[in-house]
Amino acid sequence: MEITTVSDEVIVLHDGCDVYRYEDLQPETQYTFHGLTVTTLARPDGELLSTFATVNDVHFGEVDCGVLGDNRRGPIQRSRPGDMPYPEIMNRGACAEILATHPAYVIVKGDLTHAGSDIEFDAFRDCYESHFADKLRVIRGNHDAYLGQHLYDEDLWIEMPGICVAVMDTAIPTETTGDIAAGQLAWLSERAASTDLPVLVMGHHQQWTPDPAGGTRRSEDYFGINPDSSDALNDVVAKHRNIIGYTAGHTHRHRVRSMACGVPTIEIGCV
């Protein structure tokens, strides 16, 4: 059993394929469900201007979810015999949750597929395009480019009331690791300078950050965005006070760290 979603009024827990959703809760209040204790978030002041949703690592085509190379320590998630494949179950559940929020946009941050096959891309489109149509915005991940493809590799700029979102391609075709090119960072800087609104940056790979205790190894084969490009992203963010954070997927976990400039760099768990 794990807690997968917490807002100011909703808590969602997953136990394999079983979902437990608790709604109409009070903000900043501690609750215990199924032996797990969690506190709802504070409700922001002011008027709600926009709602958008994001998912990543949806991995259509995967059978055993949670396997990393030859490491099968897991936890490994798979469907019950006779059920739809695990990604189909989880993504259709995610789409149902998202639809209930009436989002202006749904942003998918890469790893749409397991192996980058046409069948897997079609399965992704059948699920997400059928639910969200012109609200859908997509960027690729490493799994979507292992065969050298260039689908969904264009950086995107999304404007909504109260916020802008820059969605950036971090994939390197045929590679697991990530990068952001100098030209992309110049584009981000120009876009951020063009608006007074808050800007949230999104991509597939997580950012490298130095460990304050000095324990993070600086390596060109870092599993996320390489250290030099990660530093360059920090420099752009530091230059523009309206850039409020970077969010990624790739690691399949929830984690929040800080860039050197103090702005949050966030990893969002897989579907």
Predicted regions span which residues?
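Core catalytic region of metal-dependent phosphoesterases/phosphodiesterases
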Residues: 86-152, 159
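Short, surface-exposed linear motifs at loops/turns and structural transition points
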Residues: 1-47
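Active-site glycine-centered loops adjacent to acidic/histidine catalytic or metal-binding residues
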Residues: 57, 110-111, 141-142, 204, ...
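N-terminal active-site segment of His-dependent metallophosphoesterases
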Residues: 27-28, 32-118
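Binuclear metal-dependent phosphoesterase catalytic core
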Residues: 2-9, 21, 41, 184, ...
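Beta-strand-turn-beta hairpins that frame and shape the catalytic cleft
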Residues: 42-53, 61-62, 67, 157-167, ...
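His/acidic metal-ligating clusters that form di-metal
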Residues: 95-105, 175-264
